[in-house]
């Protein structure tokens, strides 16, 4: 009896091991639409084989339960599945297990299980069959579903769910990368506004352009290396250029090379020790607002050997003192002007009170602009109404009426223009163009970022 129990336990433990390794689901697939599974064990007092056991099951139950529960008929119609038998021989006896899948209802399955226990002979040997249990396959499936669902949920919980900010940042990053263009023969990384913008910002690398794009600045272009590309040199002759470099040694070297080979108008730098690609929007805006005219930087760096940041600190300290110096003497100059001073006399004190280069130019323009503005008043009213640009000869006769957008191209082709009147913004680029054409007067609505002009050219704005 002990031997029998040991063998049966060995068989059952092997089956449980297979179930744990995943055979339970493969068994489920084999059973198909099975609802129940009958598990039984048997013992035969002799050596028998698997076909002997199967034959005894079919032979000794035939006609026992009637035609409706005949095993052969049930198997043909698929209401019971393939009967599985495992046998083990030991000490002249045979032990084993029987598995019968059933698609019958629970009552019919129980009757069929009881019928198996009526088998008392297998082959030539006496035998005894005992039903261990009837398993509800659907319950097993439900258990499997629960366990598998736990595993899937744990896997899902382990995955990091991105936050809303990360998602939006990814989308913005993709859009910025799409906005990035390649400019010139060298295919330099640039913002989408570089091809047509009057002013550009020259930075060091692709990452700098992307960071500026991130904060809405779309007119940046990168030099991509320490050697300044020919495209940058060419652009510097046509546009207003601001060099915006990193606040390290590399940024200083690139800045020096830019100032030597390109026509740079302004210089801005990232805070000391920082790179343009890592700046916040606030830091970028502050750096660009603190830009310094290139002529001043060249003088300080190359002639005096001072650093850019020393110049910035000096400008900031002067800026704190400057309002007290400018606001007080100005009323005295205004009061003294109408009484006894001639226009020539008025210009001299103005140059003393206003020391910066830009402020020296303004009194010169103001002293003559009022009468000259009246000379062009008729043309100003006309361009305000019609939205065109007028090209005048020396006798103030209109020699051409053109759209404002064609003004630059026309001035490059013509050499007989004495004055230009248009309802638009006077930029550094336009001034450079008209100076090459020999124009003496340029009259516009206002001026923007004008840092240099020829001595022979007079600029008049509508507000003067």
UniProtKB/Swiss-Prot annotation:
* Enzyme nomenclature, EC number: 2.7.7.101
Presence of the UniProt keyword Signal in the record = no
Q: Which residues of the sequence carry a binding annotation for Mg(2+) 1?
A: 204, 246
Record key words, sorted: DNA replication, DNA-directed RNA polymerase, Exosome, Magnesium, Metal-binding, Nucleotidyltransferase, Primosome, Transcription, Transferase
- Residues bound to Mg(2+) 2: 246, 248
The annotated regions of Basic and acidic residues compositional bias extend over 315-333
**Free-text function comment from the UniProt entry:** RNA polymerase that catalyzes the synthesis of short RNA molecules used as primers for DNA polymerase during DNA replication. Also part of the exosome, which is a complex involved in RNA degradation. Acts as a poly(A)-binding protein that enhances the interaction between heteromeric, adenine-rich transcripts and the exosome.
Relate the assembly described in the record.
Forms a ternary complex with MCM helicase and DNA. Component of the archaeal exosome complex.
The text of the family note is: Belongs to the archaeal DnaG primase family.
The protein in question is named: DNA primase DnaG
Q: Which organism is it from?
A: Thermococcus kodakarensis (strain ATCC BAA-918 / JCM 12380 / KOD1) (Pyrococcus kodakaraensis (strain KOD1))
């Amino acid at each position: 009896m002990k031997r029998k129990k040991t063998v049966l336990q060995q068989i059952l433990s092997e089956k449980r091991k297979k179930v744990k390794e995943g055979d339970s689901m493969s068994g489920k697939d084999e059973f198909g639409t099975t609802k129940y599974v009958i598990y039984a064990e048997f013992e035969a007092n002799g050596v028998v084989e698997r076909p002997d056991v199967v034959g005894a099951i079919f032979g000794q139950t035939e006609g026992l339960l009637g035609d409706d529960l005949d095993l052969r008929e049930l198997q043909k119609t698929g209401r019971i599945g393939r009967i599985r038998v495992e046998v083990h021989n030991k000490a002249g006896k045979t032990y084993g297990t029987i598995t019968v899948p059933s698609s019958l209802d629970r009552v019919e399955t129980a009757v069929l299980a009881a019928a198996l226990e009526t088998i008392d002979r297998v082959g030539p040997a006496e035998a005894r069959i005992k039903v261990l249990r009837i398993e509800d396959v659907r319950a097993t499936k439900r258990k499997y579903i629960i366990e598998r669902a736990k595993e899937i949920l744990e896997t899902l919980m382990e995955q990091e769910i991105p936050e809303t900010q990360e998602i939006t940042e990814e989308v913005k990053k993709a859009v910025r990368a799409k906005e990035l263009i390649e400019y010139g023969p060298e295919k330099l990384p640039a913002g989408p506004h570089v091809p047509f913008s009057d002013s550009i910002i020259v930075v060091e690398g692709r990452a700098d352009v992307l960071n500026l794009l991130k904060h809405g600045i779309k007119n940046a272009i990168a030099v991509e290396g320490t050697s300044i590309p020919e495209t940058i040199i060419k652009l510097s002759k046509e546009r207003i250029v601001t060099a915006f470099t990193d606040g390290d040694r590399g940024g200083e070297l690139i800045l020096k090379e830019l100032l030597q080979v390109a026509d740079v108008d302004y210089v801005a730098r990232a805070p000391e020790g920082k790179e343009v690609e890592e700046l916040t929007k606030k830091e970028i805006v502050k750096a660009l607002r603190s830009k310094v005219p290139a002529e001043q930087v060249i003088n300080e760096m190359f002639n005096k050997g001072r650093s850019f940041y020393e110049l910035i600190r000096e400008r900031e300290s002067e800026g704190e003192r400057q309002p007290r110096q400018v606001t007080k003497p100005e009323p005295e100059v205004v009061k003294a002007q109408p009484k006894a001073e001639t226009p020539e006399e008025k210009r001299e004190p103005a140059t003393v009170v206003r020391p910066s280069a830009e402020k020296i130019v303004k009194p010169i323009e103001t002293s003559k602009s009022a009468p000259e503005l009246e000379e062009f008043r008729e043309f100003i009213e006309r361009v305000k109404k019609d939205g065109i640009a007028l090209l005048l000869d020396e006798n103030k006769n209109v020699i051409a009426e053109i759209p404002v957008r064609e003004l630059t191209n026309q001035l490059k082709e013509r050499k007989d223009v004495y004055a230009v009147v248009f309802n638009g913004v006077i930029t550094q680029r336009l001034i450079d163009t008209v100076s090459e054409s020999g124009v003496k007067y340029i009259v516009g609505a206002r001026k923007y970022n004008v840092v240099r002009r020829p001595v022979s050219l007079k600029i008049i704005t509508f507000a003067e």
